[in-house]
Every structure is written in structure tokens, then in C-alpha cells.
From Swiss-Prot:
Organism taxonomic ancestry: Eukaryota, Metazoa, Chordata, Craniata, Vertebrata
Outcome recorded upon mutating N103A: Reduces enzyme activity by about 95%
Gene: RGN
Compartmental location: Cytoplasm
Native source organism of the sequence: Homo sapiens
N6-succinyllysine carried by residues: K144, K244, K253
Protein name (Swiss-Prot/TrEMBL): Regucalcin
InterPro entries membership: 6-blade_b-propeller_TolB-like (IPR011042), Regucalcin (IPR008367), SGL (IPR013658), SMP-30 (IPR005511)
Amino acid sequence: MSSIKIECVLPENCRCGESPVWEEVSNSLLFVDIPAKKVCRWDSFTKQVQRVTMDAPVSSVALRQSGGYVATIGTKFCALNWKEQSAVVLATVDNDKKNNRFNDGKVDPAGRYFAGTMAEETAPAVLERHQGALYSLFPDHHVKKYFDQVDISNGLDWSLDHKIFYYIDSLSYSVDAFDYDLQTGQISNRRSVYKLEKEEQIPDGMCIDAEGKLWVACYNGGRVIRLDPVTGKRLQTVKLPVDKTTSCCFGGKNYSEMYVTCARDGMDPEGLLRQPEAGGIFKITGLGVKGIAPYSYAG
């Protein structure tokens, strides 16, 4: 086992950092701060951060094949023009639910942008239940709705053979799997592959590694856990010096580093004194496993 090193590479003070995505061409980490309505890009070489503020909560960001990015802003799928710091709406969901917003999102191997919604929280993880749904934005900009009755639509990724879709609805305390049809984007046969233990708290963001194992950030649990979705066993726990770990992705040279986002919202002054790096961006090295490159939206 190589020795694991955890460092806060960016003391960003995110209210709720989320959706880390590695952009190989710029050696940068993209991420969002949801309630601050910001999309951020941290250059791993210069250590500089560029921030773009939107007009509604920004819950996820993804790469786009034609250049620029796509993001979920409020209840809208948007295209982002980074240079002009502007967003163009591609589609809107949940028109009948004025209190909803998007949460986590990610692009599938065919270039569709998957993202789910939730009711706006009154406090972290406190919200009206069953208000959310899971959607995907196809490259032609039409939207498919998969299911509703979601509490907090969260982590998502696809198996290495693209035949399984993994998904987290946080308040189910479960990591679920679906059969996945890459050609059509259809999902079926939902089942649980891992139930979180009490001390692991709330499952949040998720990514897959090059060995097909899942990494889940545990909100209020201060850790990321590595799971085998085939056996349902937890293989590894990596604890961080902050409680409110929100999401994770691989990046850096050969995708050998893990980046973890976290939150400050909901912490009292004493907690912030105890965890001064809360809201920062963390880099974990020495895991001994690599990730895979993120997919880009094809529209």
C-alpha cells in the first residue's frame, strides 16, 4: 500500500463545493459553489482560480466537446461561455416546482448530460421530501425524465463497460445500480449495491476508478469510501480533516490524484475553528489507483 497524503490545495471557503471535474487540456480542476452561484476553475500549475458568478445556484459543471462547458443552474441545463462569463439556456425542467433546483450532474459515455433535482434546502440535508427527479439532456437538447420521487439527487457514474449506471439519492443512504443501454440512454432494474453504515453518514458525490470500483464522498462523515459494486463490500476508507465532504473526482497526471470538495454551510463557529480548511479543495495522492477521464457533453 502506498502512503496516502491529503492536502488542502485551495482554501476556497466554499459554502458548498461540489461537482469537481478535471480538465486535462488546461491542467485545471473545475468545481462549483452551489449557494454562492459560482463556477470555479483552479489551474494546478499556476494555482490561480477563476470564478464566474451566475444568477442562480450552480450545482454541477461538465466539459463540452465543442468547447466551453455545460452546467446546471437553478432548474436549467445551460451552455457556459467561459471567456464571456455568460450562460445560454439549453433546456428547463421542473417548471411546476418553483422551489426546486438541480443538484449533482455528470456526462455519460455517449455525451448525454445527466442531472437530478431536489427541493431547495431549509438547512443542509433538511428539505421537502420526494420533490426531485432524474433527467438527462441529449446532444440534440431534448430532455428525458427517468423517474421522480427523489429526495436529494446526487452522485452518478457509469461502469467501465458502460452497461451499468450507478446513482445516489442521498436520503436513501444507498448506492444504487441500474442496467444501462448506452445506445438509447435507457435505465432499468434498479437495485442497491451498498448501504451506508451509520458513521459514514450521508452519501453524496461519487466517481469510478480504472478498476471499476466506486468512490463515494460521505457528507458529515468526513471521508471518501471505496466500494466494490459487485460484492457490495467497502474496500477502503480515507478520512479527511473536514466533516462535510461532498464529492470527488480523479485528476492530475494520468488521473492518479483524487480531488475532494467540501462544504462550510451548516457549521457553527466552533466547528469552523476546529476545521479551518472546511470549504477547501483537497488533493489525495498515493491511493495506488487511477481514475478515468471525464466524458464531454456532445451537444
